[in-house]
């Protein structure tokens, strides 16, 4: 198999988070444009079935009976021909070789499975027992199913995936447009010191919505393989800066810890991530995830940013200097009021950098106000 035709080997699972990562790696390994996917499509078109284990170790070898050892380079045509045999196929862990063919796989029969067909039940049990992905090609149902540590994914053709991906991309464009609007409003309110918890929650809500739809599209990109290159470029352009902005908003507004309530930036981000779709639509729930009480009175209460988000927009300003400026001045309003001399009192800020920060903040303030009122 040519190196440029072969995706990265998926490896083995390791826990729930590992299973999710293995599923993505496995989808990439069988995506359109790879030799493995080409071979699977040939098997499907040839009206034959197949059971392919994507990896090998002592556990896999111990459950193999019959068949024969090959240890030959993987090619799509070889896979097609070997699937004509009545038995499973075992590939090397890097998917570069066909190790065994025509084998009968005997996984632990007590492993629970909801599959009905013999081939699919075996594939599900093998993937659960050995941790390697297993592909089952159904002759009667004419489908390719991927089993990864208890998860099952039916591989679709590119046209069906692209149709859903384009719908999701159109949704992302609308979400991003709305995010830009509320983020611009927040910037103007920050300059005027008129921000409420409601304003912050609205921006955090939109950032999370954009991030989630982008994650969904990223899954489509993985499934599409070479057919998803244009989609990947569009996605990268739309979500540029969204993840850093999400963290900056939380750093700016996560409440100061108190005796009754405290939440770190990482904890707030994790709480936002755990919100269900219905919960994300409620600003009060978003506010609680950020660390506020979420009551109607709290939503309308005033808050002031620390200044991380606006300082990050100043060109060529290192993160370490931003942290020192925020720590020294304690809030955005004091930063906006600081003179060049005041800024120079911060460690690492010389006259040139102080002037750059002063001019950068002034330009941001002017543009934010103009965008809101003009």
Curated annotation (Swiss-Prot):
GO terms for biological process: DNA repair. Residues 20-158 form the DAC domain. InterPro entries: DisA, DisA_sf, DNA_integrity_DisA_N_sf, DNA_integrity_scan_DisA_link, DNA_integrity_scan_DisA_N, DNA_integrity_scanning_protein, HhH_motif, RuvA_2-like. Diadenylate cyclase activity is inhibited by the interaction with RadA. Pfam families: DAC, DisA-linker, HHH. Coiled coil: none annotated. Its EC number is 2.7.7.85. Keywords: ATP-binding, DNA damage, DNA repair, DNA-binding, Magnesium, Nucleotide-binding, Nucleotidyltransferase, Transferase. Participates in a DNA-damage check-point that is active prior to asymmetric division when DNA is damaged. DisA forms globular foci that rapidly scan along the chromosomes during sporulation, searching for lesions. When a lesion is present, DisA pauses at the lesion site. This triggers a cellular response that culminates in a temporary block in sporulation initiation. Also has diadenylate cyclase activity, catalyzing the condensation of 2 ATP molecules into cyclic di-AMP (c-di-AMP). c-di-AMP acts as a signaling molecule that couples DNA integrity with progression of sporulation. The rise in c-di-AMP level generated by DisA while scanning the chromosome, operates as a positive signal that advances sporulation; upon encountering a lesion, the DisA focus arrests at the damaged site and halts c-di-AMP synthesis. This is DNA integrity scanning protein DisA.
